């Protein structure tokens, strides 16, 4: 093990994806990084577990039993605790390509992107239309609405914020997305799947935000571009699950001189004049344990290391389910995302279903892993909140559901304390909100915008 330096530019606590992207990018940019995790594995709350570890985590069995044994080899299972897909033209994909982390991972397309209309047994599950031709074929709309949707999608494709001739007479600096929808005469159900299954908004707040239309149009366009990249769906997902994503960035950091320490507890944060200047820590799992102290210009980390500096902003509910069949209504897709917009089932928050299978090497052949997620809206009976999603799954072989998971956000921006804290992973089934957080932390910590495009050039220059 290499010697601990007396001082680093950055100390990072926790090996979740947000933290690993930041340590990788900062290392590439020439910063001296020490990256620590109290666990013996990478990933933090977003790790991937085998089936036995999942049973043990949730306590779904009695002492002396081994319920996982009937599901084949343990090593064939890689189950994500936080289910998320990557948009093929999204920010995380751009960061992966720009940093060349793609060389450590293999991605495969997610077979379908679906949305539910209505509720209960009679609900319609259909592919989210991503272009004008699909809009005309979609069972989600009547014949006249299909034409309105077709003209809306075509307009999104030609829209240019800098060219008022493409603005349909709307003042984009002040108009709302409701004004845009009304311009095309779109029905409520159509607005629902555009806003929630294409633009991927979590609630309907975006509709009435003055000046918010350009952002919504960008998000709809990102969806369309991501579908166009590979066809079928806008999502991709790594073979063997998401657990390898943080490790890919950890490798990147290590190549550029980053130091990684697992099994290491933080005993104390050191302050001078109210600003964090270092840590006291103990590395366990070795004889004898190694106690050390080191300093840093700034400290980044996940909320679990800073309980006095974060607040709870909500709770996420997740049920991890093992199935022996694909989801109904998805044309037997081996993997898919299904979004149930909140208004369809009388809720304030959407319900997300992410389904993967042996096609992505996360379980043995013949099995499917479906994870249902939403934001808690009540204080009890949380399984009832997930019920509209669980109903879509058919017969469930095993179901793992713990108590509501708190969502944390930092209380302050970190500029005065020198501590920059990430947000918890939300209920969305994609990484766009995570990369927003990465960029936000980078901006707060360095005072600069994170420019993804030039990262590979920096690396090449550093390799010479």
UniProtKB/Swiss-Prot annotation:
Superkingdom, natural source: Eukaryota
Molecular function terms, GO-annotated: GTPase activator activity; Rab GDP-dissociation inhibitor activity
InterPro entries, per the entry: FAD/NAD-bd_sf (IPR036188), GDP_dissociation_inhibitor (IPR018203), RabGDI (IPR000806)
A single GO cellular-component term on record: cytoplasm
Keywords from the named record: GTPase activation
Keyword check for Nucleotide-binding: no
Pfam families named in the record: GDI
SUPFAM superfamilies recorded: FAD/NAD(P)-binding domain (SSF51905)
GO BP term, pick one: protein transport
Function: Regulates the GDP/GTP exchange reaction of YPT7 by inhibiting the dissociation of GDP from it, and the subsequent binding of GTP to YTP7.
Protein family membership: Belongs to the Rab GDI family.
Subunit structure: Interacts with the GDP-bound form of Rab GTPase YPT7.
Name the record gives this protein: Rab GDP-dissociation inhibitor
Name of the gene this protein is made from: GDI1
């Amino acid at each position: 093990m290499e010697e601990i330096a007396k001082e680093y530019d950055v100390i990072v606590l926790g090996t979740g994806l947000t933290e690993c992207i930041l340590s990788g990018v900062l290392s590439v940019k020439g910063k001296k990084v020490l990256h620590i995790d109290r666990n013996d594995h990478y990933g933090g709350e977003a790790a991937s577990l085998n089936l036995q570890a999942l049973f043990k985590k949730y306590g779904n069995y009695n002492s002396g039993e081994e319920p996982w044994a009937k599901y084949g080899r343990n090593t064939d299972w890689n189950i994500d605790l936080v289910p998320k897909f990557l948009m093929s033209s999204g920010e995380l994909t751009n960061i992966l390509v720009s940093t060349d982390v793609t060389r450590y991972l293999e991605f495969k397309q997610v077979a379908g992107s679906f949305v539910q209309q209505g509720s209960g047994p009679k609900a319609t599950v259909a592919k989210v239309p991503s272009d004008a031709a699909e809009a005309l074929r979609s069972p989600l709309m009547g014949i006249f609405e299909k034409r309105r949707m077709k003209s809306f999608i075509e307009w999104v494709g030609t829209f240019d914020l800098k060219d008022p001739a493409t603005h349909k007479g709307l003042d984009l600096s002040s108009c709302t997305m409701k004004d845009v929808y009304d311009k095309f005469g779109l029905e409520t159900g159509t607005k629902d799947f555009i806003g929630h299954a294409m633009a991927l908004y979590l609630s309907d707040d975006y509709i009435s935000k003055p000046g918010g239309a350009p952002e919504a149009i960008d998000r709809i366009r990102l969806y369309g571009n991501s579908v166009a990249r590979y066809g079928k769906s806008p999502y991709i997902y790594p073979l063997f699950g998401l657990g390898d994503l943080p490790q890919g960035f950890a490798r990147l950091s290590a190549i550029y001189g980053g130091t990684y320490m697992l099994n290491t507890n933080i005993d104390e944060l050191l302050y001078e004049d109210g600003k964090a200047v270092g840590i006291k820590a103990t590395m366990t799992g070795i004889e004898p344990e190694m106690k050390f102290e080191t300093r840093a210009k700034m400290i980044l980390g996940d909320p679990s290391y800073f309980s006095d500096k974060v607040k709870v902003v909500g709770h996420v509910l997740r049920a991890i389910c093992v199935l022996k069949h694909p989801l109904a209504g998805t044309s037997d897709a081996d993997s898919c995302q299904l979004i149930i917009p909140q208004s369809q089932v009388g809720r304030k928050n959407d319900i997300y279903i992410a389904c993967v299978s042996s096609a992505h090497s996360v379980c043995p052949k013949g099995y499917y892993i479906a994870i249902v997620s939403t934001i808690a809206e009540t204080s009890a009976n949380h399984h009832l909140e997930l019920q509209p999603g669980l109903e879509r799954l058919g017969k469930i072989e095993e179901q793992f559901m713990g108590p509501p998971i708190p969502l944390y956000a930092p209380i302050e921006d970190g500029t005065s304390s020198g501590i920059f804290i990430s947000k918890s992973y939300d209920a969305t089934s994609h990484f766009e909100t995570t990369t927003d957080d990465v960029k936000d932390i980078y901006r707060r910590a360095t005072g600069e915008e994170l420019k993804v495009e030039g990262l590979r050039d920096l690396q090449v220059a550093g390799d010479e």
